[in-house]
């Protein structure tokens, strides 16, 4: 380590790989690397593991930073657990999809695609399409691809309502074909269904605890409450990271650092934060500009969220249903709702049902507190119309999913090859295992696959456990 990287007297520790972030991607990357015998440390500024899918207690309830389900048919996050000696328990699986239509109320998605022959035709076309051909649809919409195979609006509705439930877009009709169809194809191949989602049987906190145990059990380190100040790059190669001194007594303390030496760094930071830690100057202008373009607020997936607890359930057809809509009675917000207690009774006190709801908003409005407050008030009034049983909850928590965001919106031209590559150009030893960079999937499974892609690239070989399962 040269004088530019560390001052005399600084503490220095050495690793094979430093992983920045202890969310799904960081924990998966750390566990995989430790399992492969690498000396790895995973760092996160939060005291909780799990990133935006962390689970925290609140007055007897267990809540996340917005609603979460696992959308892995078995070849992604589940396989990571298997490889590191753990089991990802697939708990309750979501069932049914009630659709709210302003003016007519609730109905089932099944009522919309009455001609199952048309749906089967689309499923066969997708099964016959190799993943490589789906890459050609990065800049075209989902409905354009579907219309090649059917004009049945019910089939279009099925695919587009799934995109609303996955919270990957604000305008359901303007969703990237490739990103959606990658997931549909995986779910059909692995679970014989268009959209598979389940609750982790060990709970979200247990899921992250298991991955943390896998890291330390294989000789790695996990350091929570540790802020990475910068990635150290010299002469085009990674040399390590600098972390802030803890505890930080002065709130404006600056450049008091501990140096962690490593020839490789895997960052899981999203596009809107990564250039705060990776010096922009070490990246090519075109690549840094790609990151900054995607980091615009208007491309953030954002929603106004509600946790509402009641003594009686309010579901329409099945306790584990995922309800969705494209507009509420007084807003243009699409959204979702499910009874979290039906998926995991331990997340709420006995005799209560904890419902989680989200109203998707434009990312460009995420910093407009006045607009968000007014829209939240309108949404809450609409909730009482859509579910009269939610009018008088026994417990409530409002939240805004914006910082952290759920991801970069999956509009045509903002996915696949239009995102920054996961390997930093012109910098030896730097990878980006973030779902906001080039990746496929949904939520925690997308993050796990991004981690696997970067780990295998670092290792220079595919890990046999994962066979031919999809990853970049």
What feature does the model see in each segment?
Residues 60-133:
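Dinucleotide-binding Rossmann-like beta1-alpha1 core, especially the glycine-rich loop
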Residues 229-350, 472:
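Mid-domain catalytic core of redox enzymes
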Residues 186-256:
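Helical element adjacent to the flavin cofactor pocket in flavoenzyme catalytic cores
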Residues 306-404:
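C-terminal segments that line or cap access tunnels to active or ligand-binding sites in enzymes
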Residues 380, 385-440:
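A glycine-rich dinucleotide-binding beta-alpha-beta segment and adjacent secondary-structure elements
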């Amino acid at each position: 380590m040269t004088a530019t990287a560390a001052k005399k007297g600084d503490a220095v520790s050495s690793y094979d790989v430093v992983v920045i972030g202890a969310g799904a991607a960081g924990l998966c990357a750390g566990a995989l690397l430790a399992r492969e015998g690498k000396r790895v440390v995973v760092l996160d500024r939060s005291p909780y593991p799990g990133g935006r899918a962390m689970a925290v207690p609140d007055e007897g309830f267990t809540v996340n930073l917005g609603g979460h389900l696992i959308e892995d048919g078995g070849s992604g996050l589940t396989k990571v657990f298997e490889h590191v000696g753990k089991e990802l328990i697939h708990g309750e699986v979501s069932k049914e999809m009630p659709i709210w239509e302003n003016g007519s109320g609730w109905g089932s998605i099944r009522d919309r695609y009455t001609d199952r022959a048309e749906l089967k035709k689309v499923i066969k076309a997708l099964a016959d399409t190799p993943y490589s051909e789906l890459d050609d649809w990065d800049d075209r919409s989902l409905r354009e691809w579907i219309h090649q195979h059917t004009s049945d609006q019910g089939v279009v509705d099925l695919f587009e309502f799934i995109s609303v439930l996955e919270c990957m877009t604000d305008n359901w009709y303007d969703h990237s074909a490739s990103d959606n169809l990658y997931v549909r194809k995986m779910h059909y191949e692995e679970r014989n269904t268009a959209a598979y989602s389940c609750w982790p049987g060990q709970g979200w906190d247990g899921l992250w605890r298991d991955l943390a145990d896998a890291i330390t059990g294989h000789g790695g380190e996990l350091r929570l409450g540790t802020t990475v100040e910068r990635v150290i790059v010299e002469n085009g190669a990674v040399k390590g990271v600098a972390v802030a001194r803890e505890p930080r007594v002065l709130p404006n303390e600056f450049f008091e650092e501990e140096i962690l030496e490593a020839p490789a760094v895997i960052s899981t930071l999203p596009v809107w934060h990564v250039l705060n830690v990776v010096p922009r100057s070490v990246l090519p202008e075109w690549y840094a500009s790609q990151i900054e373009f995607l980091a615009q607020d208007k491309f953030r997936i954002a929603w106004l969220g509600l946790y509402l607890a009641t003594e009686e359930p309010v579901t329409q057809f099945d306790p584990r249903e995922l309800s969705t809509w494209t507009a509420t009675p007084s807003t243009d917000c699409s959204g979702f709702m499910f009874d979290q207690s039906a998926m995991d009774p331990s997340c709420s006190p006995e005799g209560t049902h904890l419902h989680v709801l989200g109203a998707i908003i434009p990312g460009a409005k995420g910093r407009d507190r006045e607009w968000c407050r007014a829209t939240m008030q309108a949404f809450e009034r609409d909730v009482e119309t859509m579910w009269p049983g939610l009018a008088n909850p026994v417990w409530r928590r409002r939240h805004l999913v914006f910082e952290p965001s759920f991801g970069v919106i999956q509009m045509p031209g903002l996915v696949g090859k239009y995102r920054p590559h996961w390997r930093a150009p012109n910098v030896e030893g730097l990878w980006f295992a973030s779902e906001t960079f080039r990746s496929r999937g949904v939520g925690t499974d997308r993050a796990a696959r991004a981690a696997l892609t970067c780990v295998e690239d670092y290792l220079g070989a595919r890990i046999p456990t994962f066979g031919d399962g999809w990853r970049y």
